[in-house]
Amino acid sequence: MADGGKPPTPEKKSWADVEEEEEAKAKAAAAAEAASSSSSNEPAVDAQAKQIEALSLSVPEEHGGSGGGGDDQGPPLLDDSDESQIQAVTSGGTVYESAAAFEDLKLTPELLKGLHDEMGFSRPSKIQAVTLPMILTPPYKDLIAQAHNGSGKTTCFVLGMLSRVDPNRKVTQAICICPTRELAQQNKSVLMRMGKFTGITCACAIPPAQKDYVPIAKMPKITDQVVIGTSGTLMKWINHKKILTNDIKILVFDEADHMLAEDGFRSDSERIMRDIQRSAGGCQVLLFSATFNERVKDFVTRVIKDGNQIFVKKEELTLEKVKQYKVQVPDERAKIAVIKDKIFEFGQKVGQVIIFVRTKQSTKDVHNALTLEDYVCSSIQGSLDQSEREKIIQEFKNGYTKVLISTDVLARGFDQAQVNLVINYDMPIKFGTRDEPDYEVYLHRIGRAGRFGRKGAVFNLLCGETDNTVMRKIETYFQHNVPEVRNWQSEEDFERALKDAGLVE
């Protein structure tokens, strides 16, 4: 496809923004089909894989959470419960031993220095102890890995990429595909910190801001050893030969459930995978996510026919460290009243807040309603210019704003240790349905609170029978009863809820 000299028109929609009613009609049929599929999270095992041996991997007791590095109060702890049951399925005859220390993985001194000094990690988390040997032990097998938010998944694939590439070769050897620009930038930041002493460089393949636009024909070829980006931009760079794929050793899909879902980015993801596998031969493929529904699992296990698998049991995917509540309100105005008069009265004392809404218009409405009451807040959704999104994210991360209103553009992978409260202003539902919950999105949303094992609280604001139906289905699916704040007008009830969550004395 020829590249013109005009700057690209900003995308009208993002995967994370629910289309307004007239925009959604074209997707309704496909979405309804997706909604009718099973959403079980039980591990999918290929019945024909007779050589696969199921292992019950035990991790030594000293495997506490590793440091998360980064804030003034010391390294945050990972969500690394002693009760976590990791179900592993290995392919072939390789025997993997869990790693009690990063030194057990035969990493370079430069990588160990980055892990300990720059990242503040002391030892592998439970998921890292099991997963990293599978990634780093020859022969290099593909891997499907599901683990809960905050368990250390990012370190697994970032360390995998840094370990596999040769810093002396100025060619791209590792690619990581992400669903959003923000997640791509965040993963690059982690890689650059962890690999600070290795000399490895990383390019970020995301749609440029208007002011930074350069016609792709004029772009130089990418010589960074690692490229992290969104699927659309990566496809353009590969198609225009800005990235040469014949030296790729490792291909990572972060939030793989969405990257390979039919209503996500499956088309681009499959094309990138085919192109790399065709040109690079035995490229190792790593698929990481907190959730995999049954349809995605079925697709993935057909694509990855001879790989290892790691799954956390379904009942552990409820994020017990995050206290969830439901709040019955009579109307939309009452939702705003609850936020500003009840939750904010205590929420501002304990940390930052993310309010999740369903549509771009709702983002504006909630933002306007709160600013009219003199609350300082910011809002983000997919149609904003890239520079605007970056500015808003950075201001929130720096603590300049305490309240962020967002569509699901931030539901996945956004790490901000100071976020203690999440408010579901709108419950997440699947495209084209009235009351079918999007279980994966719900899990990812509540995972924004209490990152790295810290405590957090989630308030689900329910208005009418539809919201209550969605909430009941979520409780049934995750086998978790969400307690109710008895009176939406009672300050005492909200204060008691936050005390129970461990957020106020």
Swiss-Prot record:
Places the protein is found: Cytoplasm; Nucleus
Record's catalysed reaction(s): ATP + H2O = ADP + phosphate + H(+)
Listed Gene3D superfamilies: P-loop containing nucleotide triphosphate hydrolases (3.40.50.300)
One GO CC term, this protein: nucleus
SMART domains in alphabetical order: DEXDc (SM00487), HELICc (SM00490)
Residues annotated for ATP binding in this entry: 147-154
GO biological process: poly(A)+ mRNA export from nucleus; response to abscisic acid; response to cold; response to heat
Domain Helicase C-terminal: 338-493
Keywords on record: ATP-binding, Cytoplasm, Helicase, Hydrolase, mRNA transport, Nucleotide-binding, Nucleus, RNA-binding, Transport
Compositional bias (Low complexity): 27-44
Its biological purpose: ATP-dependent RNA helicase essential for mRNA export from the nucleus. Plays an important role in the positive regulation of CBF/DREB transcription factors.
Domain characteristics, as noted in the entry: The Q motif is unique to and characteristic of the DEAD box family of RNA helicases and controls ATP binding and hydrolysis.
Listed name of the protein: DEAD-box ATP-dependent RNA helicase 38
